[in-house]
């Protein structure tokens, strides 16, 4: 939709990967719609994933006992966070939709993306106390997880060996994105692209592109325990 701003947070080492193809088609389709699309390519940026005292450029409030959450909250208020954090916060602040494109690692995100979440979504910027879940500071924004898996779709069902795919999404969709106030759109899961045929992979990319054509008409999921775990 013309005038909308989209941030794609992309976490894959290889530009020619299937994840890279999904990222590229999202850039192409959303740009075609007139959206302004920004990509944070975390590996290309060599993003620091570790949450350390180097994230604070000013004086620590308690240099004797370091508490990352307390210090980054204070640094956010004092505008003394490291520039790589504030650069990403600016991108999030300006975005109407944030898409996270990544391969599933151990039922979660790659370490570099976890580091992005740990460092960028700090108290004062993404949430506060009070000021979380429906009152989170990023309310009014949309978020979407576009995930690739190693296992097949059958493995990620209630009777499959890995359980329903919604189970592993709970900490990310509810505990991170919803906690920060995002309205969460249904995930885009591309199952087992490495063992899929070329025709099947093309179908996954085409399905993602087609979905993006009407993404602005979608309603967010009810980000509740019942949605993730209900029968």
Swiss-Prot record:
Q: Which cofactor does it need?
A: Zn(2+); FAD
Instruction: Give the classification, highest ranks.
Output: Eukaryota, Metazoa, Chordata, Craniata, Vertebrata
Q: Does the keyword Zinc apply?
A: yes
Quote the catalytic activity from the record. 1-(beta-D-ribofuranosyl)-1,4-dihydronicotinamide + a quinone + H(+) = beta-nicotinamide D-riboside + a quinol
Q: What is its EC number?
A: 1.10.5.1
Origin species, per record, is Homo sapiens (Human)
TM regions (residue ranges): none
GO biological process terms, alphabetically, are: quinone catabolic process
> What is the official name of this protein in its record?
Ribosyldihydronicotinamide dehydrogenase [quinone]
- Give the main EC class: oxidoreductase
Q: What regulates the activity here?
A: Inhibited by melatonin, resveratrol and 5-hydroxytryptamine.
Assembly state and interactors?
Homodimer.
Location, primary (coarse class): cytoplasm
In the record, the note on similarity to other proteins reads: Belongs to the NAD(P)H dehydrogenase (quinone) family.
Q: Which residues bind substrate?
A: 127-129
